[in-house]
Every structure is written in C-alpha cells, then in structure tokens.
Amino acid sequence: MIQSRTHTCGELRLGNVNERVTLAGWMENVRVVGSNFAFVVLRDFYGTTQIVVETEEMMNIIKGINKESTISVTGTVRERASKNAKQPTGEIEVVPEKIEMLGRCIYNELPFEINRSREADETQRLKYRYLDLRNPEVKNNIILRCNVIAALRKAMLEHNFLEITTPILTASSPEGARDYLVPARKHPGKFYALPQAPQQFKQLLMTSGFDRYFQIAPCFRDEDARGDRSPGEFYQLDMEMAFASQEDVFSVIEDVLPPIFAKYGTYNVASSAPFKRIAYNDALEQFGTDKPDYRIDLRIQDITKLVAGSEFAPFAEGNTVKAIACSGCELTRKHIDKLCADVEVQAGFKPYWFKVEADGSFAGGVAKFMTPHHDAVVEALGLTPGTLIGIAAGKKSAAQKTAGVMRKMLGALVPGHMDKERYEFCWVVDFPMYEIGEESGELEFCHNPFSMPGGGAETLRKAIAGEIDPLTITAQQYDLVCNGIELSSGAVRNHDPEIMIEAFRLVRLGEEDVKKKSPAMYNAFCYGAPPHAGIAPGVDRMVMLLAGEDSIREIIPFPMNKNAQDILMGAPGTVTDKQLEELHIKVDIDE
C-alpha cells in the first residue's frame, strides 16, 4: 500500500529539521558523486526538494529508476551544509530510508530536457505536451490563467452579475467567421453549429428579464491562427447589461480589469479609470491603426499640404503624406535601412526617411525632396537636431498603415519613447456604421449591423432621405485595447425592430432580411426589449499580455498548432464508416 505524502516538495523548511516525512513526485535529476552517494532532485507541482542518497541499498534502488519516473520517498529532514538561497527549500534536504516506485518512465531518453522544453521544436512540445507542462515556466502560465479567471469571476459576482451558461450546440450563423458544424443524427441533412460567441443568447437573456449576465464563455471559430489568435477554440469574459449605456459598460470594465492586471501582470502598473478614449478616425490619423499603443509617445502628423508641389513622385497630388518625428534617434544608416525594410514587409508599402543634422539641415533618405519645404516642416513637426523623421506616402489607408507600423517600430527601437513596463488601456469609439465595399462599390455595414446607430432612427431616416451622408453615421460600438492589442469589441445593441429595419434599408435590405439573419432575436425584441449593451474581453489574450508571452499557445493548456491540428490527440482525424452512416454523411474528397 502506498504511503500518503506528508508534505509537498516545495514545503519543507529549517523548522522541519529532524522530522520524518514522505514526499512524492517526479525524479527530475540524479547526480552520482560516489559509489554509494548521490543527489536526487524530486519535483512535484509545488517545487523541488533535494534527496541525499548515502547507503548502498538506496543507491541500488535509484540506479534502476529512469528520470521522470514518479517515486515516493520517506526519510528524515536535515539542514543542508551547502545552502541554495535561490531555492525555497534550499536550506534543507531529505535523507531517505525508503524509496518506492509509483509510475515508471520506461524510456532512457526524453524527447527534450524538461526544464529547457521551451527551446525544443514546437511540434515536439505539442506532441509531448504532458512533458512540456512539467516545466515550471510552462506550468506557471497555466496557473496564471487559472488565477486570472478566478479573479475575473469574483469581480463580476461582486458587481452583481449572474453567471449563466448558454448552449454549446446552436444554429449556424454563416455571416460571421466559418462555423464548426455538428451533424444532427436524428435530423438527417441538418447540422448544429458550435457558437462563435454567445451573442444572441446573452441578448435574449436581457429580453428575458435578467439584468446583468456574464460567463467565461467558450467560443469556436474556424479561422486561421495568428500569434494572438488560437485556431478553433478560445474563451472570453462575456457580459451584458440591461437598461445600460456605453458608459455603464465602461464603468464596469474600468473597475474590474486594472486591479487584476496590476496584481497578476508581468508589470505591476496598469492605467486606472477613466481609460483614455479616442475616436476611430482619430486613431487612424494619430496612430495609423485602430489598436493604438499609448505607451509610445510618438504621434503621426499629416504633412500632405506642406509638401505639395514636390518633385518626389510618391508625394504627388492625390496621395496622402504622413510623418513621424522621433527625437534623440542615434540609429545608424544600416539600422535605418533595416527598419525601413521591416516596415515594408509588415505594412506592404515602402516607407521613407530623413534626419535633422546638428546644424538644422536635412540629410539622408529623401532629404533633398524635403529641403525645399524645410522651414514649414520644421515648424509643423517641431524638429530638433538628432530627430529621425519617418515618412509614409500613398493612398490614405496605405499611408496610415505604413506610418502606424513605423511608429511602433521606432517606439520600440529608440530609447525614451516607450514606457514598456506598464499596461495602458484605451477605448476606441465612434466607429463608422457604414462603408463603401471594396468589391461591391456600394454601401455596406462596416462592422456589426446589430449595433445601435448614433442618433437612432432619426439619423437613419435623414440618410435614407438623402439629407445626410450615411458614411457620417457612427455606431455605438467600442473596442477595448491594451498595449496595442485588441482585447474586445462591444456595443450598445440595437434593441428596436423598427430601427433595425431602417438600418438595413440603407444597404438595400428589408424586413425579411433582418428576420432571416436573427429570427429568434428579432421576434423576442417584438415583445419589448430593454436597451442593453455589452462586451467580451478575450481571456486568452489577457493572460498572454499578463504573462508577457508573444504566442497565445503558451497560455493554453493543450493548444492546437498553426494548422488547427491537435498533434497530441491526433485531431482532426478520420472516423468509421459506421459513424458516417449513422449521421447520413458521405465523404467525397477530390484527389
């Protein structure tokens, strides 16, 4: 019979000296220093403890055990002669009188060294994820995730939100990302879908009379992976509030998130309420993106008019010219060229540059085309000697994007322009309700068609009557951004069927189209719905930020790879002909 452990491997201290204890864990390492003398590192979830083998009997047992086997050790605690101040248990060691095998590792060689697993090939790490997770550094990310979710749940309950789970099997919503479909055995030819988000259900809860809802919601989208996006499955802090405005949502988020970021983050500084706010169009103008990183003090400025008439082709009439002035820049020509090449790869458009010399003259890059406009440019940009000016030129959207990428890279490269060790939140507001479609050339919804338009029905009717330009209509939508990463989108919902119909009329759709897109929600709203608003910050992205990781896969216990494959479990995989027959499915693959 296995003896229960009396302590964990991270627990023993000098106060336990002379106690008889039983520990259990993985045999991490063995260092033999004599015929009957060895040091063993025993590891469990809580830490490591040094075991000192001093007898022939114990040495013979240890010699027959492979690393990463699980063992039980019973022995006496004593003070270490050579202490390790870096280790919590570094002042003690255990001298064993009994060692039992619990779970044998049958392999002499491991796929990778446990404590250096992050250096291994990612495919190997995912294939042997259970070994990868034994690495304390990897394991700590999962512990962090658990703590953050617990803190989010506690905070939401304290704000009088009810945690309500919503269905996992639901109807397909093809207007969003691709759905994961689930065949319905009892209904041949029909399919459920895994929810891309609990959007309609949470709005139906508001219509049902619930006042404040939340859940740590699993969401499923068949989309490609990115560094900050896991394919397949992700989780979000989903919330909705009845009889609420944008300000009510902001108030809750600004109260809930900063303490959690300050407590659990790599950096212990997080912006407090109220968060900075910026309109969508202003964000594009000043930051070159709708995901502004306020830690960087550089701002983009428009110099189109200042360089009018320039002989430089990219500055030609009809193009937009943007500038970023970065003072105190000591980058060499080689580094500047590398910077510009990196910007072009990321933005897809070529940037330009010049510098201000000690005597105030312009040099390098496109200096000869800027010199004729010297005084005006110096005054407009507030230039001083040693300043590097990044230039982006082209169509407005291209110039904004290129300048935005260059701004971020300069902020990270040039000392003094980025306060990296903090979490800086901001709200992006006043998104356009409509846009001209690139392919159709006609008016289309810009983002969420079910958001409440600014000005409500009256604004829509004026647009339909031709009294105002529909492109000037803003939606009551908002994004939550932290350190240049979008954590969530949210909105004040359009809860009025009449306003919904007016909003769709502008894009040449009618009442039947509204009903077809969301029949249950539309019908529910016809029975009297409260004004409501919500948001859903991504849990995975929050934890990634808090852990200081660049890849979202590092904070997910069992992530898929970039190709949406679960290498560990072999998913997706084939199924039997009998299973397919029961589901009335025939697989036809083009060879």
Roles of regions detected by a PLM:
Residues 1-591:
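Class II aminoacyl-tRNA synthetase catalytic cores and aaRS-like
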